[in-house]
Amino acid sequence: MEAIKPEDLNNHIGAVRSTSWFTVTQEMINQFADVSDDHQFIHVDPEQATPIFGSTIAHGALMLSLSIGKGYETALVVEGTKMAMNYGYDQVRFINPVPVDSKCRFNSSLLEVNDKGGGRLLLKFNIELD
């Protein structure tokens, strides 16, 4: 992956970068339920979830977590960066359920570049599930 000079970041605003497609499996959902201690039936019990959603559905927090790991596929690497950190989330919404065995990918686009001084940059992205 080619590193981008900090002064060139504004040239990347609005460009959509997509991750590879992946499948949300019941095993992933079950493992996340175990780690998060969220065993709500809509996630882990197909018999109870199917009349409501047609199948079990992924946790919203699972999908948010996957956006981080999958996001490395499309990350903008800034030249000279020693460390990058997640600063937080704005306006996170879980608008539609993600049924088990869904094929998904994340689309991200750079919205803003803010120079915070002292060699620090704050990059704001929009990330959507496809």
Tell where the protein language model's regions lie, with residue ranges.
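Hydrophobic beta-strand-centered segment that forms part of the acyl-chain substrate-binding groove
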Residues: 52-55, 68-107, 111
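Predominant activation on well-ordered alpha-helical scaffold segments within soluble catalytic domains
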Residues: 30-33, 64-68
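HotDog/MaoC-like acyl-thioester-processing domains
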Residues: 1-12, 96-130
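Catalytic strand-loop segment that frames the active site of acyl-thioester-processing enzymes
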Residues: 1-58
